[in-house]
């Protein structure tokens, strides 16, 4: 305790000496030489220092009073009190050293942790920057891919439209050709029908002519000439053949069916060659 009082008194004396040095009168000549601004700053600074010194003196006086009251209350011997104070001061000093060492250890640990944290923060910042750059690159690639996809879709759509248009043109051309071909086929079939009808008519005429010739040669007592027989055999049998009848019945039927032809045949016969049955 005594050492603490001594230190407090020494500090108080130092403070008083500083106050005395600050409060020394300054000569009128020096004051006249100093500029007004510096004087104002000096006065303000002096007032601040005065307030600080007064507060320090009050604290020192308060501590001295507390120490004196403690010594009076305990009623200890001054020598024993001095030894006790010395031991307490030594213990406090040792404790202070331990606290200081612990503080330094903690400070070192904090520094190490702070260094690691700063390193980790820098690494995290670097990774964050890399991730941001990668994300930006990914966004750019995505945008490019979307643009390419849109371009491909547009191109495909245009190709499909052109293809559909071409198919429509080809289909229209095919339909037109089909219509023309169908019309041509209809004309051909119609012409073929007409030709068939004409052929039927010509065949009927030829059949009548052959029948007439056969009747004529029968009436004359001669057979058909070989060329007529061969031609008659080569004729197609499109119509059902009538059953064979006697010559008289056939002649009568023929004359009955075509009186004009019979009369013509009779008129063309020579009179001397007619052989009646």
From Swiss-Prot:
Annotated Polar residues bias: 241-253
Protein's recorded name: Outer kinetochore KNL1 complex subunit ZWINT
Function: Acts as a component of the outer kinetochore KNL1 complex that serves as a docking point for spindle assembly checkpoint components and mediates microtubule-kinetochore interactions. Kinetochores, consisting of a centromere-associated inner segment and a microtubule-contacting outer segment, play a crucial role in chromosome segregation by mediating the physical connection between centromeric DNA and spindle microtubules.
Location of the region described as Disordered in the Swiss-Prot/TrEMBL record: 228-277
Entry keyword Membrane: no
Keyword terms: Cell cycle, Cell division, Centromere, Chromosome, Coiled coil, Kinetochore, Mitosis, Nucleus
Main location: nucleus
Start and end residues of each stretch annotated as Interaction with NDC80 and ZW10: 80-155
UniProt record, GO biological process: cell division; establishment of localization in cell; homologous chromosome orientation in meiotic metaphase I; mitotic sister chromatid segregation; mitotic spindle assembly checkpoint signaling; regulation of meiosis I spindle assembly checkpoint
Coiled-coil portions: 104-217
Subunit field text: Component of the KNL1 complex composed of KNL1 and ZWINT. Part of the ten-subunit outer kinetochore KMN network that includes the KNL1, MIS12 and NDC80 complexes; a bioriented kinetochore contains approximately 150 copies of the network. Interacts with the MIS12 complex subunits MIS12 DSN1, and PMF1. Interacts with the NDC80 complex subunit NDC80 during mitosis. Interacts with ZW10. Interacts with CETN3.
Short name of one Pfam family: Zwint
Cellular component terms per the entry's GO annotation: cytoplasm; cytosol; dendrite; kinetochore; Knl1/Spc105 complex; nuclear body; nucleoplasm; outer kinetochore
InterPro entries from the UniProt entry: Zwint-1
S-adenosyl-L-methionine found in the keyword field: no
Location of this chain's protein in the cell: Nucleus; Chromosome, Centromere, Kinetochore
């Amino acid at each position: 305790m005594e050492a603490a009082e001594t230190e407090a008194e020494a500090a108080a004396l130092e403070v008083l000496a500083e106050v005395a040095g600050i409060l020394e009168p300054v000569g009128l000549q020096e004051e006249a030489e100093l500029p007004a601004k510096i004087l104002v700053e000096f006065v303000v600074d002096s007032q601040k220092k005065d307030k600080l010194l007064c507060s320090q003196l009050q604290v020192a006086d308060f501590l001295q009073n507390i120490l004196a009251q403690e010594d009076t209350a305990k009623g200890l011997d001054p020598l024993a009190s001095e030894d006790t104070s010395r031991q307490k001061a030594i213990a406090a000093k040792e404790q202070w050293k331990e606290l200081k060492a612990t503080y330094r250890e903690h400070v070192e640990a904090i520094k190490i942790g702070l260094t690691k944290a700063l390193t980790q923060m820098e690494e995290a910042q670097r990774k964050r920057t890399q991730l941001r750059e990668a994300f930006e690159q990914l966004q750019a690639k995505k945008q490019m891919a979307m643009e390419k996809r849109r371009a491909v879709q547009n191109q495909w759509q245009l190709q499909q439209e052109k293809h559909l248009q071409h198919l429509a043109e080809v289909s229209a051309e095919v339909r037109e050709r089909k219509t023309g071909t169908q019309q041509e086929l209809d004309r051909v079939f119609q012409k073929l029908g007409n030709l068939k009808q004409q052929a039927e008519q010509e065949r009927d005429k030829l059949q009548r002519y052959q029948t007439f010739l056969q009747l004529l040669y029968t009436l004359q007592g001669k057979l058909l000439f070989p060329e007529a027989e061969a031609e008659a055999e080569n004729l197609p049998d499109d119509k059902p053949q009538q059953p064979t009848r006697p010559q008289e019945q056939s002649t009568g039927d023929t004359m009955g069916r075509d009186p004009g032809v019979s009369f013509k045949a009779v008129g063309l016969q020579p009179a001397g060659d007619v052989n009646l049955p």
